[in-house]
Amino acid sequence: MARAVLVPSAPTLAPASRRRRNARRPRRASHATCVNAASYEKTWSNPSGTVMDVIEERKDSSVFACARPFVWNDIDVGGRMGVVKMRDGSLWIHSPIELDDATRTEVDALGPVKFVVSPNYEHVKYAKQWKEAYPNATLYGCPGLKAKTAGVIPYDVDLGDVPGTCPEEWNGEFQCEHFDSETTPLIGTPFFNEVVFHHIPTATLFITDLVWTYPANSVGGVDVPFGTKVWKALMDKLYLPVYLNLMVTKKTRFAESVGKVAFEWRWSTLVPCHGTVERGERARRIVRDHLERS
């Protein structure tokens, strides 16, 4: 996925007392539920217009997401940051988005930010901003990213240096899989070099650019723009076959990774960076079908 720019419009905030109350007691629903009344302009990528949505809520941990327009060549390809409130109350951030005032208010209301993760080579734009805002948090990069961005982004840990790519300090709450099976043509280096994460307590899968779930026509009462429809068609019909058949050069290794993520791991909610949150067997089928086209 090419780098793009997050462009949220200025949110309208609810009274602070209501924001704090609702942030402490997020509601659970079959679909994402807003944490508070703060809002952005409604777009297909954020049809509720909310700053943060509740995705999963369990007794001892929860998952939230912040969806924003993600504009590439005037096309909104959608962007979503995942937030996990871990069992100890600390926060794990997946693929950080721009940390504007409204987003920071919501994040800070949930708990202390302890871990921030850039899951692949592309989703790095706001990593430095988050590290500066939360200097005590550990900033993780996918394998090779720390060296790749040396002097630009201050990554603390390269997940390639961590056995199994899952740090001990995550207290066994995650399963991690590094898709180290691709090569960029003519260059010979990895393309995404993505790590996929499963938060076990909430049965939630976080995936970045390996799988997308773009809606065909509308979502949440908001029509999908023509440009986004064209983007979806190009990604589905042109890019994905090229990626799976040409760029994935280690077929056996790729199949092993797909086997773990799509079949072995016991997740039920899919939180993609690009597209809609999906649940249940439909979500698992999307991942299987997407990654088994080769």
What is the predicted function of each stretch?
Residues 71-115:
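Pre-active-site segment of Zn-dependent metallo-hydrolases
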Residues 106-172:
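Active-site HxH/HxHxD metal-binding segment of metal-dependent hydrolases
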Residues 68-70, 96-98, 121, 144-145, ...:
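Active-site metal-binding loops of divalent metal-dependent hydrolases
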Residues 38-49, 53, 93, 144-293:
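Metallo-beta-lactamase
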Residues 36-87:
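Zn-dependent metallo-beta-lactamase
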Residues 1-24:
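N-terminal chloroplast transit peptides
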Residues 60-66, 92, 172-176:
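Short, hydrophobic/aromatic-rich segments at coil-to-beta transitions
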